[in-house]
């Protein structure tokens, strides 16, 4: 990670850390870096979620892009994976998404995609950062004839929706589905897509006001959806996050089916169909021990990466795997798209239910999840979270807790890639053991580097 770019682009509190001035610089310098080798006039696609700051930041970002002669195509409100898909499909030079994903409305972010539809390599991000920090802006300043133009490209949203529907390879007639669009980027598209696929829908979290994105709805708050599934007697619930690159499901009994279980269900189906590349699923260190035991039982190999869907994608590209993801609900189907896609994942999950004739609870029952607890400890600043593992007291308590587990469980303490948080996670055979381990570590972390 660089000075401005984290694991998922540039993020911060809108109009405080991520200002219009910074958005302009990211547009100007990012656009320049990404279009240096274009033979024709470069074109860049821009999308955003429903945050109130999105229009402000989009205006500044687009101005920066136009100032270096780039043709900008404004997609308006669209899911992050929609931007990635359209950039690659249409042969655009790059794409930019304005979103802070599952974060609250006060935050926002700017994320770049290259012309291949993948998130930017670290080298390109560092190149952009160097231009931002340069003492003088020496980039070309074209006169009227060399400036870029802005085009509305709402048709792009419809193209993305049409693509999603093709991946269903049929319809979902007869299925009763609760959708939770998190008052976010999928608030119109998800209803349109699943209605066209003939599912009977109940939709929550589809009334964004600029401030309510991810508030008590969406993949990070599936409780309201779970309640609605039980109330309506639906077959399942499907919750996306603010930019719709994640999916968390709920079965017909209102039980949460997280990314690990969804990956197992879809991965096993792909294996049985001979469509799981190298019989391998790529996941991160956050995936549950029970998930890995289920994979082993099913004959599926696993490759483990650092936390972050970008690292999952890097591993998949490097070794030609086609399916991977995270417990948090990012799932990447490289046969279809270049990044995590919540709506695509939902369609694939429903497809498995349709083809097997099984309920979601039946499919999910093959994975026995070990008790897990995750606590996010807010620390003083980003420097504190990065140096946390060098603090002797924190090292000592982790070592003591690992010894107490006697090899029957695991502990993972890591910094958030996007916020000043230290994530403390443990898994063990019993809830009591997990509670004790996590609470003990959290107490020390808060005492040493927590916000007082």
UniProtKB/Swiss-Prot annotation:
Keyword Metal-binding annotated: yes
UniProt name for this protein: Phosphoglucosamine mutase
Alphabetical list of PANTHER family matching this protein: PHOSPHOGLUCOMUTASE (ALPHA-D-GLUCOSE-1,6-BISPHOSPHATE-DEPENDENT), PHOSPHOHEXOSE MUTASE
Function (record text): Catalyzes the conversion of glucosamine-6-phosphate to glucosamine-1-phosphate.
Spans through the membrane: none
InterPro entries, per the entry: A-D-PHexomutase_a/b/a-I (IPR005844), A-D-PHexomutase_a/b/a-I/II/III (IPR016055), A-D-PHexomutase_a/b/a-II (IPR005845), A-D-PHexomutase_a/b/a-III (IPR005846), A-D-PHexomutase_C (IPR005843), A-D-PHexomutase_C_sf (IPR036900), A-D-PHexomutase_CS (IPR016066), Alpha-D-phosphohexomutase_SF (IPR005841)
Organism listed in the record: Lactococcus lactis subsp. cremoris (strain SK11)
Post-translational modification: Activated by phosphorylation.
Enzyme Commission no: 5.4.2.10
Family, as annotated: Belongs to the phosphohexose mutase family.
Keywords, sorted A to Z: Isomerase, Magnesium, Metal-binding, Phosphoprotein
Reaction catalysis annotation: alpha-D-glucosamine 1-phosphate = D-glucosamine 6-phosphate
Active-site feature positions: 101 (phosphoserine intermediate)
Binding locations of Mg(2+): 101, 241, 243, 245
């Amino acid at each position: 990670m660089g000075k401005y770019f984290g694991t998922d682009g540039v993020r911060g509190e809108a109009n405080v850390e991520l200002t219009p001035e910074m958005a302009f610089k990211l547009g100007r310098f990012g656009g320049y870096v990404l279009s240096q080798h274009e033979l024709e006039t470069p074109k860049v696609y821009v999308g955003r979620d429903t945050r109130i700051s999105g229009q402000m930041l989009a205006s500044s970002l687009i101005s920066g892009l136009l100032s270096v002669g780039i043709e900008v195509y404004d997609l308006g409100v669209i899911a992050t994976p929609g931007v990635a898909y359209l950039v690659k499909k249409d042969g655009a030079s790059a794409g930019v998404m304005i979103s802070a994903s599952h974060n609250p409305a006060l935050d926002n972010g700017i994320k770049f995609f290259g012309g291949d539809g993948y998130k930017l390599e670290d080298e390109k991000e560092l190149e952009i950062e160097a231009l931002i920090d340069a003492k003088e802006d020496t980039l070309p300043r074209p006169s009227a004839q060399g400036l870029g133009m802005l085009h509305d490209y709402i048709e792009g949203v419809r193209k993305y929706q049409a693509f999603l529907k093709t991946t269903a390879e049929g319809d979902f007639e007869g299925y009763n589905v609760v959708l939770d669009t998190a008052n976010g980027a999928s608030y119109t598209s998800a209803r349109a897509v699943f209605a066209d696929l003939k599912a009977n829908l109940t939709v929550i979290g589809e009334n964004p006001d600029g401030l309510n994105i991810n508030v008590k709805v969406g993949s990070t708050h599936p409780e309201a959806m779970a309640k609605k599934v039980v109330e309506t007697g639906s077959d399942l619930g499907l919750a996306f996050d603010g930019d719709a690159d994640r999916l968390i499901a709920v079965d017909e009994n209102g039980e949460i089916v997280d990314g690990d279980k969804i990956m197992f269900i879809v991965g096993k189906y792909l294996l049985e169909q001979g469509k799981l590349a190298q019989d391998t699923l790529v996941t991160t260190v956050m995936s549950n021990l029970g998930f890995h035991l289920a994979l082993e039982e099913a004959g599926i190999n696993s490759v483990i990466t650092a936390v972050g869907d970008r690292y999952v994608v890097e591993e998949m590209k490097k070794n030609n795997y086609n399916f991977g993801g995270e417990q948090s609900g990012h799932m990447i189907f490289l046969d279809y798209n270049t990044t995590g896609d919540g709506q695509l994942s939902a369609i694939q999950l429903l497809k498995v239910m349709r083809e097997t004739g099984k309920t979601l609870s039946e499919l999910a029952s093959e994975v026995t999840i070990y008790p897990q607890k995750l606590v996010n400890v807010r620390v003083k600043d980003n420097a504190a979270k990065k140096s946390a593992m060098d603090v002797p007291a924190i090292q000592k308590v982790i070592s003591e807790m690992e010894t107490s587990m006697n090899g029957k469980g695991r502990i993972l303490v890591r910094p958030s890639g996007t916020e000043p948080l230290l994530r403390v996670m443990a898994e063990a055979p019993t809830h009591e053991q997990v509670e004790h381990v996590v609470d003990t570590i959290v107490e020390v972390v808060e005492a040493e580097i927590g916000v007082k």
